[in-house]
Amino acid sequence: MRIFSETEIRIIGCLIEKEITTPEQYPLTLNALTTACNQKSNRDPVTSLTDSDVLDSVNALIQERIITDETRGNSRVAKYQHRFCNTEFGSLKLSKQELAVLCVLFLRGPQTPGELRTRTQRLCEFDNVAQVENVLNGLSADEHSPKVIKLAKEPGKREARFAHLFCGEVSQATATVQQAPSESHDNERIVALESDVADLKLEVEELKKLINNLLDK
């Protein structure tokens, strides 16, 4: 299994997320992709990537056909889509639920099954936490190439968290430090509203670009 950088996995996670939640805006322009990477909602850690940072990683992923440039016709604006999984010749095949779980792990770091059930609501449906646990167990069951790992339960916590392995092995210390900020999130309704606002901002950016292109002609 290829090991990705943190920036690469953030980009892949954003493309997966936007493909599902805002298909009318997908594939994404570089500007929209950078905005998605740096969202303050549904991201942990929050990043401040530049267009150049994102483009460098996008170009590296294009070289490996994990991302493709889907620029059409006479358009002067490049648009990107992922080929992370479920492609005709690719070996990685994922169900909608598996893809949703990995997407949230890519974007928000280690999560409990309960958190994953709540935070995947805009991506897929889970009837209960047990279904999430079954998906996680399946993703971790591959002896030669496990996709996720169950972390040791933290003191005072009811549930153990799971982390993805696409950026390499996860140390308990690193996972704990990265999770600390998200423990202050008070309720998922506010987070969902923030995500909707972020999606609207993306649409506004795309409309601005379209208007500018029309004015230039």
Curated annotation (Swiss-Prot):
<protein>
    <recommendedName>
        <fullName>UPF0502 protein VFMJ11_A0613</fullName>
    </recommendedName>
</protein>
<dbReference type="InterPro" id="IPR036390">
    <property type="entry name" value="WH_DNA-bd_sf"/>
</dbReference>
<comment type="similarity">
    <text>Belongs to the UPF0502 family.</text>
</comment>
<dbReference type="InterPro" id="IPR007432">
    <property type="entry name" value="DUF480"/>
</dbReference>
<dbReference type="Pfam" id="PF04337">
    <property type="entry name" value="DUF480"/>
</dbReference>
<dbReference type="InterPro" id="IPR036388">
    <property type="entry name" value="WH-like_DNA-bd_sf"/>
</dbReference>
